Amino acid sequence: MGQKVHPIGMRVGIIRDWDAKWYAEKEYADYLHEDLAIRKFIQKELAEASVSTIEIERAINKVIVSLHTAKPGMVIGKGGANVDALRAQLNKLTGKQVHINIIEIKSPDLDAHLVGENIARQLEQRVAFRRAQKQAIQRTMRAGAKGIKTQVSGRLNGADIARAEGYSEGTVPLHTLRADIDYAWEEADTTYGKLGVKVWIYRGEVLPARKNTKGGK
């Protein structure tokens, strides 16, 4: 059987940037565990705030966390109360000075994480899986995507045997490295168990910047 490579991991360093931007030698494992703890904490605290990507940069005793969210008002809170509380909790968690940048996602329907999350929440509310996928596809195509593919897998409609069912519209060129493909995987907790939701969104081509090579013209 043919298996699909992770569309984002395949494009990192070509048209995608890293979500963690730091370098370490002996402290590598400590930093990695700290990154995972930060991401887990933010995803738990801001579960309703439509947070998609969490980027982490490091300097000496300083951590810069950039949150890409469709609901910046919910993250910031009244007079900045929520973001101040989050910063204090992250300072305590890491023992370092944490700076938080909030970046608004202008088109949530073109973000695979948010589209997948929306489908998963609908499945938890007993919306038919076909309807949830087709509605998400229509919204994404209306938002200007070149193509989208979705897949829901598990005990669909409570069936005894798990299966996967997906829909697509437009083109999703998984082999084209310059194709800007956003991918996400989400889970829905239903009464019959967990359902997996996968979303691929093709947003157009990106021409990678030419890198200067030593001795190159």
Swiss-Prot record:
UniProt xrefs under Pfam families: KH_2, Ribosomal_S3_C
SMART domains hit by this protein: KH
Matching InterPro entries: KH_dom, KH_dom-like_a/b, KH_dom_type_2, KH_sf_prok-type, Ribosomal_S3_C_sf, Ribosomal_uS3_bac-typ, Ribosomal_uS3_C, Ribosomal_uS3_CS
KW rRNA-binding (keyword) present: yes
CC annotations in GO: cytosolic small ribosomal subunit
GO MF entries: mRNA binding; rRNA binding; structural constituent of ribosome
Domain KH type-2: 38-106
Calcium recorded as keyword: no
Entry's Gene Ontology BP terms: translation
Cross-referenced CDD domains: KH-II_30S_S3
PROSITE patterns for this protein: KH_TYPE_2, RIBOSOMAL_S3
Keywords from the named record: Ribonucleoprotein, Ribosomal protein, RNA-binding, rRNA-binding
Record's function text: Binds the lower part of the 30S subunit head. Binds mRNA in the 70S ribosome, positioning it for translation.
Family listed: Belongs to the universal ribosomal protein uS3 family.
Subunit structure: Part of the 30S ribosomal subunit. Forms a tight complex with proteins S10 and S14.
The name this protein goes by in its record: Small ribosomal subunit protein uS3
Organism: Streptococcus uberis (strain ATCC BAA-854 / 0140J)
Gene name tied to this protein: rpsC
